[in-house]
Amino acid sequence: MTCTIVVGGQWGDEGKGKIISYLCKKDNPSIIARGGVGPNAGHTVEVDGEKYGIRMVPTGFPNVNAKLAVGAGVLTDPEVLLKEIQMLEKFNVGERMIIDFRCGIIEEIHKELDKSNEHLSKEIGSTGTGCGPANVDRAMRTLKQGKDVESISKYLGDVSEAVNEALEAGYNVLIEGTQGSLLSLFYGSYPYVTSKDTNAASFAADVGVGPTKIDEVVAVFKSYPTRVGEGPFPTEMSVEEAESLGVVEYGTVTGRRRRVGYFDHELAKKVCRLNGATQIAITCLDKYDNECYGITEYEKLSEKGKAFIKEVEEKVGVKVTLISTGPELTQTIDVRNK
């Protein structure tokens, strides 16, 4: 039995979707449970060359043997959820989905408030998905819960009970975090943050798992960090620099161009300490050095690629166990058992 949490180490968009999908295939968890804020964070999953952009369904959905869960701490937009279940019909997502009956519900009024609030939309760079206003209502105890919405009633259940029973029975469980540690309401660059905490301890609480049940925390870092929206970015490079390196990205949810920077070892060290990270996953190493593209054995990485990994381990103090060298799941180096 192993309970693993995957957390973003930067400002989101680190490639958690790829790492989560890989772990779900390799480790075959019984339940894949989603923590985090809500549908404000998007993940892109590539399966057999086809890309899926999702915001509610756990990104481990390609593992058709696992139950998929959305924890009580996660805000749920029924409209988004039902569209994704339909889109992923060939993966039998609807038959495997458990939405906690206590989850908070985003309604149209929350999205309207989010988009019309000038402070949130222009100064902070909110995604406009209604999460902030919904969390306000939750704090005021006026927010609807999953059990109050008929359209999702067939998917409702007790996620905490399901996850804990799976762990007690000796099964693997994977908890998906969303966004990144540096967007945490508590520990990020306030006020340019999201509407709740985005660290491992909170993700465990979101799905109803106690801290002593967590075995592994995988912090995911991209070889070059990116950020959507406003806020400090200590190692940010110019648009011209990013384009010269061939690094041009757009957000999954907002479609806004991502700001790009250089890897920040000091911030990475703080993030790993904050999350109690036991492992690091590095994504997009092939963007740092295209000679690393598609490599699946550590020994075959370029010297430049190896030097990057070594520097991360030495300066951050946590072992790099997973390295992504391309978008496909097979383009992954896994040294966890070496």
Swiss-Prot record:
<dbReference type="Pfam" id="PF00709">
    <property type="entry name" value="Adenylsucc_synt"/>
</dbReference>
<dbReference type="GO" id="GO:0005737">
    <property type="term" value="C:cytoplasm"/>
</dbReference>
<feature type="active site" description="Proton acceptor">
    <location>
        <position position="13"/>
    </location>
</feature>
<keyword id="KW-0479">Metal-binding</keyword>
<feature type="binding site" description="in other chain">
    <location>
        <position position="256"/>
    </location>
    <ligand>
        <name>IMP</name>
    </ligand>
</feature>
<protein>
    <recommendedName>
        <fullName>Adenylosuccinate synthetase</fullName>
        <ecNumber>6.3.4.4</ecNumber>
    </recommendedName>
</protein>
<dbReference type="GO" id="GO:0005525">
    <property type="term" value="F:GTP binding"/>
</dbReference>
<feature type="binding site">
    <location>
        <position position="141"/>
    </location>
    <ligand>
        <name>IMP</name>
    </ligand>
</feature>
<dbReference type="InterPro" id="IPR027417">
    <property type="entry name" value="P-loop_NTPase"/>
</dbReference>
<feature type="binding site">
    <location>
        <position position="42"/>
    </location>
    <ligand>
        <name>Mg(2+)</name>
    </ligand>
</feature>
<keyword id="KW-0658">Purine biosynthesis</keyword>
<feature type="binding site" description="in other chain">
    <location>
        <position position="127"/>
    </location>
    <ligand>
        <name>IMP</name>
    </ligand>
</feature>
<dbReference type="InterPro" id="IPR042111">
    <property type="entry name" value="Adenylosuccinate_synth_dom3"/>
</dbReference>
<dbReference type="GO" id="GO:0046040">
    <property type="term" value="P:IMP metabolic process"/>
</dbReference>
<feature type="binding site">
    <location>
        <begin position="252"/>
        <end position="258"/>
    </location>
    <ligand>
        <name>substrate</name>
    </ligand>
</feature>
<feature type="binding site">
    <location>
        <position position="258"/>
    </location>
    <ligand>
        <name>GTP</name>
    </ligand>
</feature>
<comment type="subunit">
    <text>Homodimer.</text>
</comment>
<feature type="binding site" description="in other chain">
    <location>
        <begin position="13"/>
        <end position="16"/>
    </location>
    <ligand>
        <name>IMP</name>
    </ligand>
</feature>
<feature type="binding site" description="in other chain">
    <location>
        <position position="194"/>
    </location>
    <ligand>
        <name>IMP</name>
    </ligand>
</feature>
<keyword id="KW-0342">GTP-binding</keyword>
<keyword id="KW-0963">Cytoplasm</keyword>
<comment type="pathway">
    <text>Purine metabolism; AMP biosynthesis via de novo pathway; AMP from IMP: step 1/2.</text>
</comment>
<feature type="binding site">
    <location>
        <begin position="284"/>
        <end position="286"/>
    </location>
    <ligand>
        <name>GTP</name>
    </ligand>
</feature>
<dbReference type="InterPro" id="IPR018220">
    <property type="entry name" value="Adenylosuccin_syn_GTP-bd"/>
</dbReference>
<feature type="binding site" description="in other chain">
    <location>
        <begin position="40"/>
        <end position="43"/>
    </location>
    <ligand>
        <name>IMP</name>
    </ligand>
</feature>
<dbReference type="InterPro" id="IPR001114">
    <property type="entry name" value="Adenylosuccinate_synthetase"/>
</dbReference>
<dbReference type="InterPro" id="IPR042110">
    <property type="entry name" value="Adenylosuccinate_synth_dom2"/>
</dbReference>
<comment type="similarity">
    <text>Belongs to the adenylosuccinate synthetase family.</text>
</comment>
<keyword id="KW-0436">Ligase</keyword>
<dbReference type="InterPro" id="IPR042109">
    <property type="entry name" value="Adenylosuccinate_synth_dom1"/>
</dbReference>
<feature type="binding site" description="in other chain">
    <location>
        <position position="179"/>
    </location>
    <ligand>
        <name>IMP</name>
    </ligand>
</feature>
<keyword id="KW-0547">Nucleotide-binding</keyword>
<keyword id="KW-0460">Magnesium</keyword>
<dbReference type="GO" id="GO:0000287">
    <property type="term" value="F:magnesium ion binding"/>
</dbReference>
<dbReference type="GO" id="GO:0044208">
    <property type="term" value="P:'de novo' AMP biosynthetic process"/>
</dbReference>
<dbReference type="GO" id="GO:0004019">
    <property type="term" value="F:adenylosuccinate synthase activity"/>
</dbReference>
<feature type="binding site">
    <location>
        <position position="13"/>
    </location>
    <ligand>
        <name>Mg(2+)</name>
    </ligand>
</feature>
<comment type="function">
    <text>Plays an important role in the de novo pathway of purine nucleotide biosynthesis. Catalyzes the first committed step in the biosynthesis of AMP from IMP.</text>
</comment>
<feature type="binding site">
    <location>
        <begin position="324"/>
        <end position="326"/>
    </location>
    <ligand>
        <name>GTP</name>
    </ligand>
</feature>
<feature type="active site" description="Proton donor">
    <location>
        <position position="43"/>
    </location>
</feature>
<feature type="binding site">
    <location>
        <begin position="12"/>
        <end position="18"/>
    </location>
    <ligand>
        <name>GTP</name>
    </ligand>
</feature>
<feature type="binding site">
    <location>
        <begin position="42"/>
        <end position="44"/>
    </location>
    <ligand>
        <name>GTP</name>
    </ligand>
</feature>
